[in-house]
């Protein structure tokens, strides 16, 4: 049965405005609440719809990822909507509303589950052999729905700042009269919700004895997902965009909550997966992947591969092409930056002895990718910028791509993809950032906590076989190293777009976008020359999204600064 369920008794209360409620009711609209509450599966369908509204970025902007609005990548199709983020073409009438809509959809469904379907008993199924198990899962829905509602509010606050806070099903009049509350109040709500439910929600769906669930249920929010949301939200709340007064106690709380995630994960037998690339392949959903805390799994598809396979492959679009900015961020295996004295970097053999994560993330000239064909991104090459929609940077994307995918018009295949939302490595990095900003040093642990920022970062670096962080760095030098580590470890996972905003450092990083010009010499050798391929400007109003103009009018929102 499909996921969307509508009931006429609630329809009038829920179809009110795009700023607060679900707009796209299509199925079962002749049925009422009594119809839905008769069966586990019908109430479960509402929960499924909540999870379906969790956003992922396998090319949300007609193939482009949010990273292509940053220094992470460039989308190879000129004129794509992603360019609006850096050419100033977005605004209240072109507001990039995807998450604005899906988050309110998810909040609406969450409120429906909590208000209307919180006390079902399913009497017709009491004799069913699975009744106890189904009721156990059903009683967990209230905690899943509260987690999801908090998650959707986090997605809103990190984009828009203050928004209306809607915590129950409402009439149209009530919804349209909701006040817009400050961002800090939204963060308080998220923190309180997560604190209230983290000890009540299921800890591990696969470890419940005779109540354990089949594999398909393990993608639901559990205790660690609740703790992870709370910790990430605390990090954002402590960051300059939302912490104008520089309140250091917020950094301490963020460190404490990230440490709690790490401790709980260890208790559950989790750790960093030895093979970084396995986090993003077609089998990443399997139980053996002990680093992923929560992910959004998609149906089988080859669209992401079609978007991002190199031009020159049948039916490929070229897609999100990693920048030289990103490639340069990968250190040498000796732990030195490529421009650091003693690094050993050879500009004419630029990918030799580099951090192993580079080869797992970026496809470079001369390697076989995605299959047996050698990638030719040199000037005039089969996969180069000289071909329509060929890479403008000299690189193609590897991360998240299932290289066994065939996208040809005949004989194609497809695989599921799993968009990683929370994974353990992030929380070592989050801890490091919070500890650094609280103590002012990369080498001092906050009171009552077990690690320094350097020690936390070293856990992530060890998996990549990179040396430990250097000692004796100043605050600014350590911060730069930390931001670089976060850039490479979390590349193309949806963080860069928001990290540069919450740090309020976008102008520093988003000015010159660089690529690699590769020229084949007469003797067959390659000449490598880094070059600036775009120079961009920044407007501080872009730190927050504009509210859609129609909702400013309908929902009494105050437009974000600079967008009026």
Identify the meaning behind each predicted range.
Residues 18-20, 91, 103-106, 191, ...:
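Long, intrinsically disordered, low-complexity segments
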Residues 155-159, 164, 205, 236-245, ...:
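Short coil/turn linking the two alpha-helices of tandem helical-hairpin repeats
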Residues 1-17:
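Sec-dependent bacterial lipoprotein signal peptides
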Residues 41-48, 52-56, 78-160, 175-188, ...:
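Conserved, well-structured interaction surfaces
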């Amino acid at each position: 049965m499909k996921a969307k369920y509508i009931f006429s008794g609630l329809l009038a209360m829920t179809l009110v405005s795009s700023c607060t409620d679900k707009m796209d009711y299509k199925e079962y609209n002749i049925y009422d609440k009594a119809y839905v509450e008769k069966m586990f599966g019908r109430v479960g369908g509402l929960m499924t719809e909540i999870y379906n509204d969790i956003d992922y970025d396998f090319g949300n902007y007609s193939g482009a990822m949010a990273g292509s609005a940053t220094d992470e990548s460039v989308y190879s199709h000129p004129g794509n909507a992603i360019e609006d983020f850096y050419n100033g073409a977005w605004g209240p009438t072109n507001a990039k509303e995807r998450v604005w809509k899906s988050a309110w959809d998810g909040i609406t469904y969450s409120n429906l589950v909590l208000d209307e379907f919180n006390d079902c008993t399913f009497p017709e199924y009491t004799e069913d052999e699975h009744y106890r198990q189904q009721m156990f899962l059903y009683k967990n829905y209230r905690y899943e729905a509260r987690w999801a509602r908090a998650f959707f509010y986090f997605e809103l606050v990190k984009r828009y700042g203050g928004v209306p806070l809607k915590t129950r099903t409402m009439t149209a009049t009530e919804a349209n009269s909701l006040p817009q509350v400050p961002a800090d109040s939204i963060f308080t709500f998220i923190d309180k919700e997560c604190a209230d439910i983290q000890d009540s929600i299921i800890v591990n769906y696969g470890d419940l004895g005779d109540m354990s669930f089949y594999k398909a249920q393990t993608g639901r929010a559990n205790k660690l997902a609740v703790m992870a949301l709370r910790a990430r939200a605390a990090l954002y709340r402590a960051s300059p965009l939302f912490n104008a007064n520089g309140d250091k106690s917020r950094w301490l709380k963020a460190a404490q909550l990230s440490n709690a995630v790490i401790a709980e994960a260890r208790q559950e037998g989790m750790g960093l997966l030895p093979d970084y690339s396995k986090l993003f392949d077609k089998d990443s959903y399997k139980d053996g992947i002990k680093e992923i805390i929560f992910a959004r799994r998609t149906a089988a598809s080859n669209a992401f591969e079609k978007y991002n396979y190199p031009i020159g492959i049948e039916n490929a679009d070229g897609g999100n092409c990693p920048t030289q900015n990103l490639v340069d961020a990968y250190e040498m295996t000796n732990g030195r930056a490529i421009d650091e004295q003693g690094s050993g970097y050879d500009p004419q053999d630029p990918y030799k002895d580099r951090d192993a994560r580079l080869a797992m993330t970026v496809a470079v000239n001369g390697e076989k990718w995605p299959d047996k064909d050698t990638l030719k991104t040199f000037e005039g090459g089969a996969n180069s910028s000289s071909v329509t929609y060929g890479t403008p940077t000299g690189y193609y994307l590897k991360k998240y791509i299932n290289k066994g995918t065939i996208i040809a018009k005949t004989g194609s295949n497809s695989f599921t993809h799993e968009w990683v939302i929370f994974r353990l490595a992030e929380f070592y990095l989050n801890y490091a950032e919070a500890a650094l900003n609280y103590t002012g040093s990369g080498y001092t642990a906050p009171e009552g906590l077990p690690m320094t920022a350097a020690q936390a970062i070293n856990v992530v670096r060890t998996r990549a076989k990179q040396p430990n962080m250097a000692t004796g760095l100043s605050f600014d030098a350590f911060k730069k190293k930390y931001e670089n580590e976060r850039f490479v470890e979390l590349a193309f996972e949806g963080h860069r777009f928001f990290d540069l905003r919450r740090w309020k450092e976008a102008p520093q990083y988003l000015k010159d976008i660089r690529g690699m010009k590769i020229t084949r010499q007469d003797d067959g050798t390659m000449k490598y020359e880094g070059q600036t391929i775009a120079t961009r400007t920044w407007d501080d109003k872009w730190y927050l999204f504009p509210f859609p103009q129609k909702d400013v009018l309908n929902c009494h929102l105050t437009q974000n600064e600079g967008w009026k």
